[in-house]
Amino acid sequence: MKRFTRAYSSATTTLGAAPIPASKIKYIPSTGTYPKGFVASGVFVGVKPGNTSKPDLAIISSDRPCAAAGVFTKNKFQAAPVTFSRKLLQQKKNAGLRSVVINSGNANAVTGTGGLEDATNMARTTDQRVGDEDSTLVMSTGVIGQRLPIQKIVDHIPMAYHKAGDSHSHWLNCAKAICTTDTFPKLMSRTFELPSSPGVEYRIAGLTKGAGMIAPNMATLLTVLATDAPIAPAVMPNVLRHAVDRSFNAITIDGDSSTNDTVALLANGAAGGKEIASEQSPDFEAFQGLLTEFSADLAKYIVRDGEGATKFVTIRVVDSATEEAARQVARSIATSPLVKTALYGKDANWGRILCAAGYALISPPGQPINDVPEIVPERTNVSFVPTDGSTELKLLVDGEPEQVNEERASEILAMEDLEIVVRLGTGDKSAVHWTCDFSHDYVTINGDYRT
């Protein structure tokens, strides 16, 4: 499948009143190619007290019905918009959706029946503008346990819909509007082709937010993916789940899982061509690969914007007996506070990596002790791999510690991007997880969050 990409740079330098860090501006696109039939907007409402300028209400809408799918939080205290949107997709059988409305600054979580009424009110107000009943998904992000200023929000939905457009600036404003502690808006778009429709240019766009409460099973993470490719409602859930498991469920900032996680995919078919209706078709395989790669690239932006983070770290577990074992080991290492603080301190304390790998697969307290045949200490290898192409630094070889060159280790750990590779030596399966370090700023940001 032919794919087209674009360069990244931007004149955008602020997010609301806050300056975007110079090191993050390179991740903001200056142009984009957006899916046909979709429009987007981001407007200022003032949902969170103290916000006086940053857009905090977003709408993405299609000029025709879409096939749609969603992947949601597994947190038992799921937020009202999650409950509403999950039920709507089930009711509509993943068909006939037209729009997504999103507010930032308030999560509308743990807000009782009133919170569900507020989410419904947001959807119904948007439906009236779109002209279709039961056609709007709802997302919210922000502080938990407080009711939305719902009248203020619904009063601004008509304006948000009226201001929606298909230009790059419209999509960028939309991406800005869903941010909370993010330091930069996260937006991507690409064009691609499918095997059965050579010469037809399809487009996909995605925007996401998240900088804290990020862990597997998603976290305070909202994502909307939109494409003009023709995809049947029946195959939407599986193609999205496959992509999410290998992208948004493979990132960690702090190990906390939020009440509001939502990743939604909308496909309106506006570009034409043959509908992807079978999971056995070459088109399905091609789109699944494209969506997974696209989602992974978008998810990496969240890690790069981790609260207080100074490093982007890839945890790669290879030569595993099973893919699931590799995932669990990678996740355990990526989530370990001891590993993450050592990375911040440029400390080559590989014992912490081994420790996190060693407890990844053991049974929980109160359960029979399992043997964990997937991990054999005398077959395990650990290395630091620099991203500049230079030679990897071996820390552990077949269970035996290496004489580590501390100066070389410090050079690698000083890099903004680095990779930790764990070879289990028990099979041929692998998994990857993306994470960041823990710095002093993480505590400062989260200590001040409600203020």
Curated annotation (Swiss-Prot):
It comes from the Eukaryota. The record marks T141, G142 as: Involved in the stabilization of negative charge on the oxyanion by the formation of the oxyanion hole. The active site is at T220. Pfam families: ArgJ (PF01960). GO terms for biological process: L-arginine biosynthetic process; ornithine biosynthetic process. Its main location: mitochondrion. One of its GO terms (cellular component) is mitochondrial matrix. It is found in: Mitochondrion matrix. Its EC number is 2.3.1.35, 2.3.1.1. GO terms for molecular function: glutamate N-acetyltransferase activity; L-glutamate N-acetyltransferase activity. Pathway: Amino-acid biosynthesis; L-arginine biosynthesis; L-ornithine and N-acetyl-L-glutamate from L-glutamate and N(2)-acetyl-L-ornithine (cyclic): step 1/1; Amino-acid biosynthesis; L-arginine biosynthesis; N(2)-acetyl-L-ornithine from L-glutamate: step 1/4. Keywords: Acyltransferase, Amino-acid biosynthesis, Arginine biosynthesis, Autocatalytic cleavage, Mitochondrion, Multifunctional enzyme, Transferase. Substrate binds at T180, K209, T220, E307, N446, T451. It catalyses: N(2)-acetyl-L-ornithine + L-glutamate = N-acetyl-L-glutamate + L-ornithine; L-glutamate + acetyl-CoA = N-acetyl-L-glutamate + CoA + H(+). The record marks A219, T220 as: Cleavage. PANTHER family: ARGININE BIOSYNTHESIS BIFUNCTIONAL PROTEIN ARGJ, ARGININE BIOSYNTHESIS BIFUNCTIONAL PROTEIN ARGJ, MITOCHONDRIAL. Heterodimer of an alpha and a beta chain. Catalyzes two activities which are involved in the cyclic version of arginine biosynthesis: the synthesis of acetylglutamate from glutamate and acetyl-CoA, and of ornithine by transacetylation between acetylornithine and glutamate. Belongs to the ArgJ family. This is Arginine biosynthesis bifunctional protein ArgJ, mitochondrial. The lineage of its organism: Eukaryota, Fungi, Dikarya, Ascomycota, Pezizomycotina.
